[in-house]
Amino acid sequence: MAAGPTTATDGRPPAPTGAASRRLALGALLVVLVGWSLTGLDVTVDRLLGAPGDSWDIFRRMFPPAFAEAAERGVVGKVFESVHIAWIGTLIGALVSLPLAFLAAGNVAPAWVRVPVRQLFNVIRAVPELILAMILIPVTGLGPWAGALAIGVHSIGTLGKWATEAIEGIDEGPLEAVAATGGRWASSMRWGVLPQILPVVTSQWLFRFEINVRASAVLGMIGAGGVGSELVSQLVFRNFPAVGAVLFMTIVVVLSIDTAGP
């Protein structure tokens, strides 16, 4: 009697499909990339195994936090200076990015305008706030103004992209209604688009403000205002109780802003 066709039930695994082969190749590529990255970072097994213990030792030395010493050094004022930097930077980003977003959205702007504005957003997002602050410090001098401008410029790229996506996701009905009444482009944006995107864009601004508070603390490390300069100073002298106080106050402020948000 002739043997029937061979099936997967014969005990042999089925031949790998194209999708399975691609997943296997992708997994192998990821393993190679991780190994290559670790080699480039000069990471050794001893350092990896010792990292948890070293981190715990530093964390333990931060307690109890030296709140009295931090208050004497004006850390509270520096923390709120970081908040002020973040607020001004977010305001700059919001005011500039929203009009540009109308020029970048594919459903309301022509390609000859849309493409350059989108590329502008991409270029801005490609430069970190830290680099922007280093570029601006020779112009503005050391202090919070450089930090606020750096955060503001970077926020334009991020908020502009988010607002563009919000505009492209609107209901086209109100736009058609305004156009049917003879309204021009500006009227369509004012009455057909803005009411739809404003709740979303407002929440994006608040979210970006939370991010900017954390970014402003980092900018202080290069002299761009905020609490970062005090944090670096205490780390250099290995005054970990004071470092703990600075970090605690910064975390409390960030959590308070997050709780107060929508």
Question: Language-model segments: which ranges?
Answer:
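Transmembrane alpha-helices and adjacent helix-loop boundaries
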Residues: 109-111, 126-132, 213
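Transmembrane-helix boundary motif in ABC transporter permease subunits
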Residues: 88-121
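Generic hydrophobic transmembrane alpha-helix motif, especially the helices
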Residues: 121-155
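Membrane-cytosol interface at the C-terminal ends of specific transmembrane alpha-helices
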Residues: 142-208, 262
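Alpha-helical membrane-interface segments at transmembrane helix boundaries
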Residues: 76-84, 117, 121-124, 206, ...
